From Swiss-Prot:
Record GO biological process: mRNA processing; regulation of gene expression; rRNA processing; tRNA processing
Enzyme Commission numbers on file: 3.1.26.3
Cofactor: Mg(2+)
Gene name of the encoded protein: rnc
Residues reported to bind Mg(2+): 59, 132, 135
GO cellular component, as recorded: cytoplasm
Family from the record: Belongs to the ribonuclease III family.
Reactions the enzyme catalyzes: Endonucleolytic cleavage to 5'-phosphomonoester
Protein name: Ribonuclease 3
Lineage start: Bacteria, Pseudomonadati, Chlamydiota, Chlamydiia, Parachlamydiales
Active site: 63, 135
RNase III domain boundaries: 18-146
Stretches with biased composition (Basic and acidic residues): 218-227
Length: 242
């Protein structure tokens, strides 16, 4: 069941509830206006002309901060994992469904300020809005307290979920990509060696994967097989998989 969205005296309500919101976040804002702004959806200001800012700029910033923090974490935690597989794991951790999980686990969606039309929408748009809210909160914390504050918030609250995703066995990316291409293009993907370097006993291959004259992804590895898997994983990081 979707949460009930509060709409009577909404800005004042969020301001009054700031301590409760901060307790759930585990972070206290120096500038409370950033906290309030994170909860203002564009549809709300369309119906409340006295409000002239919404959370999309914070969402834009938070998206980049979240991606950087997850990339840094994966790079340090998985030093031997190829680039393509890192890209796939990052996409799993920052995709909309993960962001929705993050925000729902904090039980903050009831404070979100929406216009009447969005409040009445019980479709998929709500998930997108909740994911945007999470990114806006990340952006607000980053602006208020810096990168370390955003990092502390993310990993203090969601480290367990991140570890569960990382513990999921890595898939056969080539087989998955082949199935995807056959289903959507009725063709199998083609792999092309772009570059190889290093001595014979320590080669590094860079390979791209193509479908219908369109490059889908690239990957590196110490063998062609490993590089192909990395390229397939990179390609799959850009599409939705079940």
């Amino acid at each position: 069941m979707l949460p009930r969205i509060l709409y009577m005296n909404p800005i004042e309500h969020v301001i009054r509830q700031a301590p409760a919101i901060e307790a759930k976040l585990g972070y206290t804002f120096k500038d409370p206006q950033l906290l309030v702004l994170a909860f203002v959806h564009r549809s709300f200001i369309n119906e409340n002309r006295e409000v002239n800012q919404h959370n999309e700029r914070l969402e834009f910033l938070g998206d980049s901060v979240l991606g950087m923090l997850i990339s840094d974490y994966l790079y340090c935690k998985l030093p031997k994992t190829p680039e393509g597989q890192l890209s796939y794991l990052r996409s799993r951790l920052v995709e909309a469904s993960s962001c929705v999980h993050y925000i729902q686990s904090l039980d903050l969606s009831g404070y979100l300020l929406l216009g009447k039309g969005e409040r009445m929408n019980d479709g998929r748009g709500r998930e997108s809005i909740l994911a945007d809210l999470f990114e806006a909160i990340i952006g607000a914390i980053y602006l208020d307290g810096g990168l370390q504050a955003a990092k502390d918030f993310l990993f203090k609250n969601f480290h367990q979920h991140i570890e569960i995703i990382l513990a999921t066995p890595l898939r056969n990316w080539k087989a998955l990509l082949q199935d995807y291409c056959q289903k959507n293009y009725q063709q199998t993907p083609l792999y092309q060696v772009l570059h190889e370097s290093g001595p014979d006993h320590s080669k590094v291959f860079q390979i791209s994967v193509w479908i219908q004259d369109r490059e889908l992804g690239r990957g590196k590895g110490t063998s062609k097989k490993e590089a192909q898997q990395a390229a397939a994983a990179d390609a799959l990081s850009r599409v939705e998989l079940p």
